[in-house]
């Protein structure tokens, strides 16, 4: 698709706005159906018919902080939402197998690659940290789980603190208490004498991909699942503890904010880029709060999974 440059309701083929697009260009039909937010700058509209735009990227623009914002057609968003539902159910269904893999290999006396994979998977399923490709570390010093170094691990007698700067220069901090099952394996893996050494020095992107492949999911699926799992846990906790309970709308907004803080997003990104909409629609029901208040978290999670699964099957 050809990128066209937008200014004051007009389209141009160049970013100096010297060469206007003809009035019969199909992109103008698209503009009749969408509203481009006035606060966006450097807006690019993609040349396509309205029918094509329903399933594609329509336009991109920069917000006040210089971040590029992407706007898609209705059908694309519906397909993306349905995909998130499927990912949530798929990962839930393999979590027992993943935990079995962790339990089997984390008991090893050596710190071989399988031991490191077990610690990696335990950390990922606890904190849902971004993968951390080597190219991003080299290009902009963005750190993820695979590119953690010993210097990012601070050890004390009662806890271990993991600190690093991730995507979009967001600072992350995770605390592992001594009572947590991750504490001893992480302590065993960390070498204070080599601060620049990678924590997972026997792993590579290929080894992690091969490991995760056996479960029929992708590493990024764990993060999608994790955001929704964290939201559900926070929602369940809020229903149990917040008094008086706010309206479902306010409760959802509070829970999304809490979830975003845990995973290192803004609330809007958590909701737009990761949340399964079937889950959001489910918890909007005021009568559902009574069900939540009477269940354990595992029971609540099972109810949600069954509902999402029935929605995807339908």
From Swiss-Prot:
GO biological process: DNA topological change
Family affiliation: Belongs to the type IB topoisomerase family.
Disulphides: none
Role noted for this protein: Releases the supercoiling and torsional tension of DNA introduced during the DNA replication and transcription by transiently cleaving and rejoining one strand of the DNA duplex. Introduces a single-strand break via transesterification at the specific target site 5'-[CT]CCTTp site in duplex DNA. The scissile phosphodiester is attacked by the catalytic tyrosine of the enzyme, resulting in the formation of a DNA-(3'-phosphotyrosyl)-enzyme intermediate and the expulsion of a 5'-OH DNA strand. The free DNA strand then undergoes passage around the unbroken strand thus removing DNA supercoils.
Coiled-coil annotated residue ranges, if any: none
Domain Topo IB-type catalytic, residue spans: 77-314
Subcellular localization(s) per the UniProt record: Virion
Family annotation (Gene3D superfamilies): DNA topoisomerase I domain (3.30.66.10), Topoisomerase I, Chain A, domain 3 (3.90.15.10)
Name of protein: DNA topoisomerase I
Keywords assigned: DNA-binding, Isomerase, Late protein, Topoisomerase, Virion
EC numbers: 5.6.2.1
Reported induction: Expressed in the late phase of the viral replicative cycle.
Molecular-function GO terms, alphabetical: DNA binding; DNA topoisomerase type I (single strand cut, ATP-independent) activity
Reaction(s) catalysed by this chain's protein: ATP-independent breakage of single-stranded DNA, followed by passage and rejoining
